[in-house]
Amino acid sequence: MKQYFNCIGIVGRPRHSTALITHEILYKWLIKKGYQVFIEYNISKKLNLKNPKTATLIEIGRLCDLAIVIGGDGNLLFTARILSYFNIKIIGINCGNLGFLTDLNPDNKFKKLSEVLSGKYFVENRFLLDVMIYKKEQVSKSSIAINEVVLHPKNVAHMIEFEVYINDNFAFSQRSDGLIISTPTGSTGYSLSAGGPIIETSLESILLVPMFPHTLSARPLLIRSDSVIRLRFSDIETDLKISCDSQIVLPVKKKEYVFIRRSNYYLNLIHPKSYNYFETLTSKLNWSKKFF
């Protein structure tokens, strides 16, 4: 039988014994099927396996053509920010809460994985966001995000002032608790909680969602994904932060400004052929069922 994947990496950040057991069972299942399998080095030390092949995340990105992430969406976000720099496909087994990205149910994971490994899958290329903090025309800090980039104050419930430029054109100024700049992937995350719309993941767009703005006229704004966003701040602003996927935090100092744009890198997320995005929304968000 043709092998669509030759080398597979198993990654995750397990916090519960059930997730650790899933790592062990999956490793043995893949080895039995004849695949070359690497387990992320930090996880392997916690598993009861005899001489498994181990690798760092970067090594998995270089060596493997498929990474299986075991955990919740947070695990996949952490992993994908590194693996997106490599030509590797990613699929997730949900051991967390919602599981918008890790869409394989642990109860039927082997059935769905068998479909994928036999070539019955499709690829979604989810774009990322680059964020760069500039000081005197030089990049002082940078990162990437899959879900969203969030501007917020260091202190909770502290209003800030900023201006937003899109493609070097002034768009709006705002007094608010911050601003969420989201990808379509992130539209079911933080921005949804802030009143933003859900964006179908194949749409090439970026979403700007105000956080508790001090005006009723402030509304979410959807722009083209090839737009370049620049954030400027008044000289009195101090202790501002930029958060990427709620996992990486970059401080913004006085006289610094922020650029956000679509990255050249993608998350190569794969799904079984039977995957249905709207079915996922219905089940995860408890939407109404069909009438007929």
UniProtKB/Swiss-Prot annotation:
The UniProt record lists the keyword Methyltransferase: no
HAMAP family given in the database record: NAD_kinase
Classification via InterPro entries: ATP-NAD_kinase_N, ATP-NAD_kinase_PpnK-typ_C, NAD/diacylglycerol_kinase_sf, NADK
Protein name: NAD kinase
Cofactor: a divalent metal cation
E.C. numbers: 2.7.1.23
Active site positions, chain numbering: D73
SUPFAM superfamilies, A to Z: NAD kinase/diacylglycerol kinase-like
One Pfam family hit: NAD_kinase
GO MF, any single term: NAD binding
GO BP: NAD metabolic process; NADP biosynthetic process
GO cellular component: cytoplasm
Subcellular localization: Cytoplasm
Record key words, sorted: ATP-binding, Cytoplasm, Kinase, NAD, NADP, Nucleotide-binding, Transferase
Family in the record: Belongs to the NAD kinase family.
Record field: catalytic activity: NAD(+) + ATP = ADP + NADP(+) + H(+)
Known role: Involved in the regulation of the intracellular balance of NAD and NADP, and is a key enzyme in the biosynthesis of NADP. Catalyzes specifically the phosphorylation on 2'-hydroxyl of the adenosine moiety of NAD to yield NADP.
Keyword Manganese belongs to the record: no
Residues that coordinate or bind NAD(+): D73, G74, N147, E148, H158, R175, D177, T188, G189, Y190, S191, L192, S193, Q247
Species annotation: Buchnera aphidicola subsp. Schizaphis graminum (strain Sg)
Gene encoding the protein: nadK
